[in-house]
């Protein structure tokens, strides 16, 4: 696909695939505005100066404008879409770098609304033949509304780049927190796994399979809550089984390693791998001798859980890392598991005290 065809595809996406989700009510807008205001007061752009406090009314106004193109709500005069452009934003420090572009802290100039602006180079997307993957990411993520899923407010493009306007996750990548901590405490890990299960339950009810769960694709919000991101490998699969090999090697389930059909239950396996890595500090099937050895360990479910992992957490991990997808613990069971319940009161109380 040429750059021009990619541009045409994105233009079609803007009009033909609006979200069917209704605009949020005033109270939800206010909560989002207050949350963003807290982040404005705690971050700085490239000049290193703190941003000035912006009123709730301005934030509400900003959110209403951002919501319209996402929700696909036409004005009274007809389907007139709000056009975003790069000149609307003050670009700040880089937040991350990927293979095809970067993510920057940015501020909408008129309102002071803080976002993360993801830039993708069209030529590199075309060269790597992942245009459909990007389109799919936009289609899926723009329709999602969940507190533990990173929000996509909108998108636009120019001659060379595609820009995704994303929710700013104030505490950054979960992977970096895990690296610094080596491994998480049971209380912290159980909170994150509960929130992940909650987010995945929402996705699966919408027939969305994430397929690339790993610490690098999870961010933390300003209150330390999980924000699942990176929907490039996600699919909307209402009824069909899929055979595409995708995702990250350490997190691939046996059915994908073996080239078999797979369903949303691949995300259950990945949740088990994630639980293990949170508590141990490394994925369970990683083999330093190479990819082939890792594939074999996954296919055999060669699982060795260290003795310091408590029995109830071992039970959760073992019941998610089942070779047969149908035998894996459901997300509802995960959220009610004794290991989760044991710590839930503690992190729920701490969350309410900090809010």
From Swiss-Prot:
Component of the chromosomal passenger complex (CPC), a complex that acts as a key regulator of chromosome segregation and cytokinesis. Has a role in error-correction of aberrent kinetochore-microtubule attachments to ensure that sister kinetochores become bioriented and connect to opposite poles by promoting spindle assembly checkpoint signaling. Ark1 is also required for phosphorylation of histone H3 that accompanies chromosome condensation and condensin recruitment to mitotic chromatin. Its EC number is 2.7.11.1. It comes from Schizosaccharomyces pombe (strain 972 / ATCC 24843). The active site is at 212 (proton acceptor). GO terms for cellular component: chromosome passenger complex; chromosome, centromeric region; chromosome, telomeric region; cytoplasm; inner kinetochore; kinetochore; meiotic spindle; meiotic spindle midzone. Belongs to the protein kinase superfamily. Ser/Thr protein kinase family. Aurora subfamily. InterPro entries: Aur-like, Kinase-like_dom_sf, Prot_kinase_dom, Protein_kinase_ATP_BS, Ser/Thr_kinase_AS. It holds the Pfam family Pkinase. The gene is ark1. This is Aurora kinase.
């Amino acid at each position: 696909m040429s750059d021009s065809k990619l541009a045409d595809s994105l233009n079609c996406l803007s009009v033909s695939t609006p979200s069917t989700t209704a605009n949020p009510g005033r109270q939800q807008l206010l909560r989002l505005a207050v949350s963003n205001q807290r982040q404005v007061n705690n971050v700085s752009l490239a000049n290193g100066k703190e941003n000035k406090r912006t009123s709730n009314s301005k934030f509400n106004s900003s959110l209403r404008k951002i919501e319209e193109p996402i929700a696909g709500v036409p004005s009274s005069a007809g389907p007139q879409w709000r056009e975003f452009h790069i000149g609307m934003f003050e670009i700040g420090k880089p937040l991350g770098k990927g293979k095809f572009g970067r993510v920057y802290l940015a501020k909408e100039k008129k309102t002071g609304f803080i976002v993360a602006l993801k830039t993708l180079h069209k030529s590199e997307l075309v060269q790597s033949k992942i245009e459909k993957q990007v389109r799919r990411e936009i289609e899926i993520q723009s329709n999602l509304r969940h507190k533990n899923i990173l929000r996509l407010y909108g998108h636009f493009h120019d001659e060379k780049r595609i820009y995704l306007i994303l929710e700013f996750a104030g505490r950054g990548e979960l992977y970096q927190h895990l690296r610094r901590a080596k491994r998480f405490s049971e209380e912290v890990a159980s909170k994150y796994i509960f929130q992940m299960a909650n987010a995945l339950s929402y996705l699966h009810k919408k027939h969305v399979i994430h397929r690339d769960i790993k610490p690098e694709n999870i961010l933390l919000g300003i209150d330390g809550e999980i924000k699942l991101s990176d929907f490039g490998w996600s699919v909307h699969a209402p009824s069909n089984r899929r055979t595409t090999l995708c995702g990250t090697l350490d997190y691939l389930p046996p059915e994908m390693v073996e080239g078999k059909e797979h369903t949303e239950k691949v995300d259950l396996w990945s949740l088990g791998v994630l639980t293990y890595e949170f508590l141990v500090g490394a994925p369970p099937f990683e083999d330093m001798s190479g990819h082939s050895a890792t594939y074999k360990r996954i296919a055999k479910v060669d699982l060795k859980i260290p003795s310091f992992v408590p029995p109830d957490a071992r039970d959760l991990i073992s019941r998610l890392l089942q070779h047969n997808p149908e035998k894996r613990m459901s997300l509802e069971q995960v959220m009610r598991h004794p290991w989760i319940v044991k710590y839930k009161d503690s992190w729920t109380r701490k969350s309410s005290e900090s809010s």
